[in-house]
Amino acid sequence: MLDAIRKNGVTLAVFAAITTGLTAVINAVTKPTIEHQTAVQQKILLDQVVPPELYNNRIQDECYSVTDPALGNTNPHHLYLARKDDKPVAVALETTAPDGYSGNIQMIVGASFDGIVYGTRVVEHHETPGLGDKIELRISDWINSFNGKKVNGPSDGHFAVKKDGGDFDQFTGATITPRAVVNAVKRTTLYIETLPGQLSSLPTCGDANE
Protein backbone atom coordinates (compact mmCIF):
# COMPACT_ATOMS: atom_id res chain seq x y z
CA MET A 1 0.00 0.00 0.00
CA LEU A 2 2.85 2.36 0.84
CA ASP A 3 4.41 1.64 -2.54
CA ALA A 4 1.13 2.56 -4.22
CA ILE A 5 0.95 5.81 -2.27
CA ARG A 6 4.55 6.65 -3.18
CA LYS A 7 3.86 5.82 -6.84
CA ASN A 8 0.79 8.04 -6.88
CA GLY A 9 2.74 10.81 -5.19
CA VAL A 10 5.48 10.63 -7.81
CA THR A 11 2.89 10.63 -10.59
CA LEU A 12 1.20 13.72 -9.16
CA ALA A 13 4.54 15.48 -8.75
CA VAL A 14 5.51 14.74 -12.36
CA PHE A 15 2.08 15.89 -13.57
CA ALA A 16 2.36 19.10 -11.55
CA ALA A 17 5.84 19.77 -12.94
CA ILE A 18 4.67 19.19 -16.52
CA THR A 19 1.62 21.42 -16.00
CA THR A 20 3.75 24.19 -14.50
CA GLY A 21 6.19 23.93 -17.37
CA LEU A 22 3.45 24.08 -19.98
CA THR A 23 1.89 27.09 -18.27
CA ALA A 24 5.23 28.88 -18.28
CA VAL A 25 5.76 28.11 -21.97
CA ILE A 26 2.26 29.28 -22.89
CA ASN A 27 2.73 32.49 -20.91
CA ALA A 28 6.07 33.13 -22.59
CA VAL A 29 4.59 32.57 -26.04
CA THR A 30 1.42 34.62 -25.53
CA LYS A 31 2.88 37.51 -23.51
CA PRO A 32 4.31 39.42 -26.52
CA THR A 33 1.00 39.09 -28.37
CA ILE A 34 -0.99 40.32 -25.38
CA GLU A 35 1.40 43.23 -24.84
CA HIS A 36 1.16 44.16 -28.53
CA GLN A 37 -2.64 44.07 -28.47
CA THR A 38 -2.69 46.18 -25.31
CA ALA A 39 -0.37 48.75 -26.91
CA VAL A 40 -2.53 48.90 -30.04
CA GLN A 41 -5.69 49.47 -28.02
CA GLN A 42 -3.95 52.11 -25.94
CA LYS A 43 -2.81 53.98 -29.07
CA ILE A 44 -6.34 53.86 -30.48
CA LEU A 45 -7.67 55.38 -27.25
CA LEU A 46 -5.02 58.10 -27.19
CA ASP A 47 -5.74 59.03 -30.80
CA GLN A 48 -9.40 59.45 -29.90
CA VAL A 49 -8.59 62.18 -27.38
CA VAL A 50 -5.58 63.79 -29.09
CA PRO A 51 -5.83 63.85 -32.91
CA PRO A 52 -2.73 62.10 -34.34
CA GLU A 53 -2.12 64.88 -36.87
CA LEU A 54 -1.23 67.17 -33.98
CA TYR A 55 1.86 65.24 -32.93
CA ASN A 56 4.69 63.14 -34.36
CA ASN A 57 6.22 61.48 -31.29
CA ARG A 58 5.34 58.08 -29.83
CA ILE A 59 2.87 59.48 -27.35
CA GLN A 60 2.36 56.18 -25.55
CA ASP A 61 6.08 56.08 -24.73
CA GLU A 62 6.02 59.53 -23.08
CA CYS A 63 4.10 58.54 -19.99
CA TYR A 64 4.38 60.52 -16.76
CA SER A 65 2.76 60.21 -13.37
CA VAL A 66 0.86 63.15 -11.88
CA THR A 67 -0.95 63.52 -8.59
CA ASP A 68 -3.31 66.40 -7.91
CA PRO A 69 -6.74 66.79 -6.27
CA ALA A 70 -7.94 68.42 -9.51
CA LEU A 71 -7.90 64.91 -10.99
CA GLY A 72 -10.59 63.75 -8.60
CA ASN A 73 -8.46 62.18 -5.88
CA THR A 74 -4.86 61.97 -4.71
CA ASN A 75 -4.03 58.77 -6.58
CA PRO A 76 -1.37 58.89 -9.32
CA HIS A 77 -2.78 59.38 -12.82
CA HIS A 78 -0.99 58.76 -16.10
CA LEU A 79 -0.22 61.65 -18.41
CA TYR A 80 0.75 61.05 -22.05
CA LEU A 81 2.65 63.92 -23.65
CA ALA A 82 2.11 64.79 -27.31
CA ARG A 83 4.96 66.56 -29.09
CA LYS A 84 5.22 68.11 -32.54
CA ASP A 85 8.85 68.28 -33.68
CA ASP A 86 9.85 67.83 -30.03
CA LYS A 87 7.66 70.72 -28.83
CA PRO A 88 4.98 69.80 -26.26
CA VAL A 89 1.60 70.58 -27.80
CA ALA A 90 -1.00 68.62 -25.82
CA VAL A 91 -1.55 65.89 -23.28
CA ALA A 92 -3.87 62.97 -22.74
CA LEU A 93 -4.48 62.78 -19.02
CA GLU A 94 -6.25 60.16 -16.97
CA THR A 95 -8.70 61.65 -14.50
CA THR A 96 -11.46 60.66 -12.11
CA ALA A 97 -14.96 62.02 -11.63
CA PRO A 98 -15.50 61.04 -7.97
CA ASP A 99 -19.11 62.20 -7.85
CA GLY A 100 -20.83 59.89 -10.31
CA TYR A 101 -24.22 58.50 -9.35
CA SER A 102 -22.66 55.09 -8.66
CA GLY A 103 -19.17 56.14 -7.64
CA ASN A 104 -15.98 56.93 -9.49
CA ILE A 105 -16.00 57.47 -13.24
CA GLN A 106 -12.56 56.87 -14.74
CA MET A 107 -11.81 58.98 -17.79
CA ILE A 108 -9.08 60.25 -20.07
CA VAL A 109 -9.07 63.83 -21.34
CA GLY A 110 -7.03 65.20 -24.22
CA ALA A 111 -6.43 68.94 -24.27
CA SER A 112 -4.04 71.67 -25.33
CA PHE A 113 -2.16 73.86 -22.88
CA ASP A 114 -4.48 76.78 -23.63
CA GLY A 115 -7.70 75.12 -22.56
CA ILE A 116 -8.99 73.50 -25.74
CA VAL A 117 -10.47 70.04 -25.24
CA TYR A 118 -9.62 67.69 -28.10
CA GLY A 119 -11.47 64.65 -26.84
CA THR A 120 -12.72 62.73 -23.83
CA ARG A 121 -13.43 59.08 -23.21
CA VAL A 122 -14.87 57.20 -20.25
CA VAL A 123 -12.79 54.09 -19.59
CA GLU A 124 -14.56 52.69 -16.52
CA HIS A 125 -17.79 53.40 -14.67
CA HIS A 126 -20.65 51.81 -12.74
CA GLU A 127 -23.47 54.13 -13.79
CA THR A 128 -27.03 52.93 -14.28
CA PRO A 129 -27.61 51.05 -17.56
CA GLY A 130 -30.08 52.87 -19.77
CA LEU A 131 -29.57 56.15 -17.92
CA GLY A 132 -26.08 57.19 -16.87
CA ASP A 133 -24.28 54.86 -19.27
CA LYS A 134 -24.88 57.33 -22.11
CA ILE A 135 -21.44 58.67 -21.22
CA GLU A 136 -20.07 55.68 -23.17
CA LEU A 137 -19.35 56.30 -26.85
CA ARG A 138 -20.75 52.90 -27.83
CA ILE A 139 -24.14 53.94 -26.45
CA SER A 140 -24.29 57.66 -27.23
CA ASP A 141 -22.17 60.30 -28.98
CA TRP A 142 -22.74 62.70 -26.05
CA ILE A 143 -19.10 62.38 -25.00
CA ASN A 144 -18.08 63.97 -28.31
CA SER A 145 -19.81 67.21 -27.32
CA PHE A 146 -16.57 68.23 -25.59
CA ASN A 147 -14.55 68.13 -28.81
CA GLY A 148 -13.13 71.55 -29.68
CA LYS A 149 -14.64 73.30 -26.65
CA LYS A 150 -12.49 75.75 -24.73
CA VAL A 151 -12.51 76.19 -20.97
CA ASN A 152 -12.29 79.90 -20.24
CA GLY A 153 -11.14 79.81 -16.65
CA PRO A 154 -12.58 78.37 -13.43
CA SER A 155 -15.66 80.61 -13.58
CA ASP A 156 -16.65 79.58 -17.13
CA GLY A 157 -20.38 79.02 -16.71
CA HIS A 158 -20.72 77.53 -20.18
CA PHE A 159 -18.81 74.45 -19.04
CA ALA A 160 -21.73 72.92 -17.15
CA VAL A 161 -24.87 70.95 -17.91
CA LYS A 162 -27.83 72.97 -19.17
CA LYS A 163 -29.71 72.44 -15.91
CA ASP A 164 -26.90 74.39 -14.23
CA GLY A 165 -26.90 77.11 -16.91
CA GLY A 166 -24.22 75.57 -19.13
CA ASP A 167 -24.00 74.27 -22.68
CA PHE A 168 -23.97 70.50 -22.16
CA ASP A 169 -27.06 68.30 -22.31
CA GLN A 170 -28.04 66.24 -19.31
CA PHE A 171 -29.72 62.88 -19.73
CA THR A 172 -33.41 62.24 -19.22
CA GLY A 173 -33.73 60.97 -15.68
CA ALA A 174 -29.99 61.28 -15.04
CA THR A 175 -28.33 64.61 -14.34
CA ILE A 176 -25.78 63.56 -11.75
CA THR A 177 -23.71 61.46 -14.17
CA PRO A 178 -23.24 64.03 -16.97
CA ARG A 179 -22.69 66.77 -14.40
CA ALA A 180 -19.88 64.74 -12.84
CA VAL A 181 -18.25 64.16 -16.24
CA VAL A 182 -18.54 67.81 -17.33
CA ASN A 183 -17.05 69.02 -14.06
CA ALA A 184 -14.20 66.51 -14.30
CA VAL A 185 -13.37 67.55 -17.86
CA LYS A 186 -13.36 71.20 -16.80
CA ARG A 187 -11.12 70.60 -13.76
CA THR A 188 -8.74 68.42 -15.74
CA THR A 189 -8.45 70.89 -18.63
CA LEU A 190 -7.73 73.74 -16.22
CA TYR A 191 -5.07 71.58 -14.58
CA ILE A 192 -3.50 70.81 -17.97
CA GLU A 193 -3.08 74.56 -18.50
CA THR A 194 -0.77 74.65 -15.47
CA LEU A 195 1.49 71.84 -16.70
CA PRO A 196 4.02 73.40 -19.13
CA GLY A 197 6.31 74.56 -16.34
CA GLN A 198 6.14 71.19 -14.59
CA LEU A 199 6.75 68.77 -17.45
CA SER A 200 10.50 68.50 -16.99
CA SER A 201 10.12 67.50 -13.34
CA LEU A 202 7.34 64.92 -13.64
CA PRO A 203 8.27 61.33 -12.76
CA THR A 204 7.90 58.83 -15.57
CA CYS A 205 5.36 56.05 -15.27
CA GLY A 206 6.78 53.28 -13.15
CA ASP A 207 9.18 55.54 -11.28
CA ALA A 208 6.52 56.99 -9.00
CA ASN A 209 4.74 55.13 -6.22
CA GLU A 210 1.81 53.96 -8.32
From Swiss-Prot:
Looking at the keywords, is Electron transport present?
yes
Residue ranges annotated as transmembrane are 9-29
Modified residues annotated as FMN phosphoryl threonine in this record: T175
Q: Top-level EC class, please?
A: translocase
Q: How does the record say this protein sits in the membrane?
A: Single-pass membrane protein
Q: Which residues form a coiled coil?
A: none
Keywords of the record: Cell inner membrane, Cell membrane, Electron transport, Flavoprotein, FMN, Membrane, Phosphoprotein, Translocase, Transmembrane, Transmembrane helix, Transport
The GO molecular function terms of this record are: electron transfer activity; FMN binding
* Entry EC no(s): 7.-.-.-
Essential cofactor(s): FMN
Subcellular location per UniProt equals: Cell inner membrane
Q: Which domain of life is it from?
A: Bacteria
Protein purpose: Part of a membrane-bound complex that couples electron transfer with translocation of ions across the membrane.
| Similarity field | Belongs to the RnfG family.
Quaternary arrangement and interactors, per the entry?
Answer: The complex is composed of six subunits: RnfA, RnfB, RnfC, RnfD, RnfE and RnfG.
What's the protein here called? Ion-translocating oxidoreductase complex subunit G
- Lineage of origin: Bacteria, Pseudomonadati, Pseudomonadota, Gammaproteobacteria, Enterobacterales
